[in-house]
UniProtKB/Swiss-Prot annotation:
Protein name: Pantothenate kinase
Record's keyword annotation contains Acetylation: no
Species, as recorded: Yersinia enterocolitica serotype O:8 / biotype 1B (strain NCTC 13174 / 8081)
Known pathway: Cofactor biosynthesis; coenzyme A biosynthesis; CoA from (R)-pantothenate: step 1/5
Catalytic reaction annotation: (R)-pantothenate + ATP = (R)-4'-phosphopantothenate + ADP + H(+)
Keyword field: ATP-binding, Coenzyme A biosynthesis, Cytoplasm, Kinase, Nucleotide-binding, Transferase
EC number, as in UniProt: 2.7.1.33
Family: Belongs to the prokaryotic pantothenate kinase family.
GO biological process, one term: coenzyme A biosynthetic process
InterPro entries named in the record: P-loop_NTPase, PanK, PRK/URK
Gene expressing this chain: coaA
Molecular function in Gene Ontology: ATP binding; pantothenate kinase activity
Binding positions for ATP per the UniProt entry: 95-102
Upper lineage: Bacteria, Pseudomonadati, Pseudomonadota, Gammaproteobacteria, Enterobacterales
Length: 316
């Protein structure tokens, strides 16, 4: 099979790092090194070069898509003879635990909000739509947190549907990784943003992933552009363990932390527990429920060591 035949056989355009970086064009870097440090995750080496070569071209592409969507809305309003109602553009970001979804989401929020159009960009994680621990315990699902059955999908779909319908304000519950639970009365209010970034394990899932709870509309039905952050499983496991060890030295030392009892563990024991958690929960969820959604994404970013993106696939 020739290279052209291989290209025609896939629904994606494929770029290596150099090819993708060239698509930045002349987009200026609007973030300082200090701001990037604040945006990056606990376990990631995020450089100015990474932002310039990977995330600036991505923000440029998204800006084109968003502008095109606004023009399409204007055409519809002209046809209907109606005044414009602001309908948010929804970007979904999916991928495994520890792959760096949150950093990608925060970076895009910062970059997209600094385009000349000064668009308002809100960020919501689907963790907020996990059932509270009390419910998960009652249903025997604490070891399935993050699996499809651990989410209140009806509430999540209702939230995204209301945002996408242009509701004045919509309320989302907030999840705390410190207490490992939904924050009581910790709701976040979303007020008609131009862009909503929805980050979570499950934003690309569909009816096939929820046979236990059949319903006909899914989060993916409301997503305008979706990104899957990918990496080999051996790297994901290593990043998860390293993140666990850093939390053990930091967040776990807080007496309010759900995992406070892990703070004083010897490192060898902590590695053993983190490895077990990966194999029994996160790695299993990746194989069964997350990885199968990858090819539904509009764009796939594949990372190598040190969280550096080595290739990008963009749906044709």
């Amino acid at each position: 099979m020739t290279k052209r035949d291989q290209s025609l056989a896939t629904p994606y355009l494929q770029f290596d790092r150099t090819q993708w970086a060239a698509l930045r064009d002349s987009v200026p870097l609007t973030l300082t090194e200090e701001e990037i440090v604040k945006l990056k995750g606990i376990n990631e080496d995020l450089s100015l070069d990474e932002v310039a070569q990977i995330y600036l071209p991505l923000s440029r592409l998204l800006n084109f898509y968003i502008s095109s969507n606004l023009r399409r809305q204007a055409v519809l309003e002209q046809f209907l003879g109606t005044d414009g109602q602001r309908i948010p553009y929804v970007i979904g970001i999916a991928g495994s635990v520890a792959v760096g979804k949150s950093t990608t989401a925060r970076l895009l929020q910062a970059l997209l909000s600094r385009w000349p159009e000064h668009r308002s960009v809100e960020l919501i994680t689907t963790d907020g739509f996990l059932y509270p621990n009390k419910v998960l315990n009652e249903r025997g699902l604490m070891k399935k947190k993050g699996f499809p059955q651990s989410y209140d999908m009806h509430s999540l779909v209702k939230f995204v549907s209301e945002v996408k319908s242009g509701a004045d304000h919509v309320t989302a519950p907030v999840y705390s990784h410190l207490i490992y639970d939904i924050v009581p009365d910790g709701n976040k209010i979303i007020k008609q943003p131009d862009i909503l970034i929805l980050e979570g394990l499950n934003v690309l899932q569909s009816g096939m992933d929820y046979p236990h709870d059949p319903h006909h509309v899914f989060v993916s039905d409301f997503v305008d552009f979706s990104i899957y952050v990918d990496a080999p499983e051996d790297l994901l496991q290593s990043w998860y363990i390293n993140r666990f060890l850093k939390f053990r030295q930091g967040a776990f030392s807080n007496p309010d932390s759900y995992f406070h009892n892990y703070a004083k563990l010897p490192e060898t024991e902590a590695v053993k527990i983190a490895t077990q958690l990966w194999k029994e929960i996160n790695g299993l969820n990746l194989k069964q429920n997350i990885l199968p959604t990858r090819e539904r994404a509009s764009l796939i970013m594949t990372k190598s060591a040190n969280h550096a993106v080595e290739s990008v696939r963009l749906r044709k």
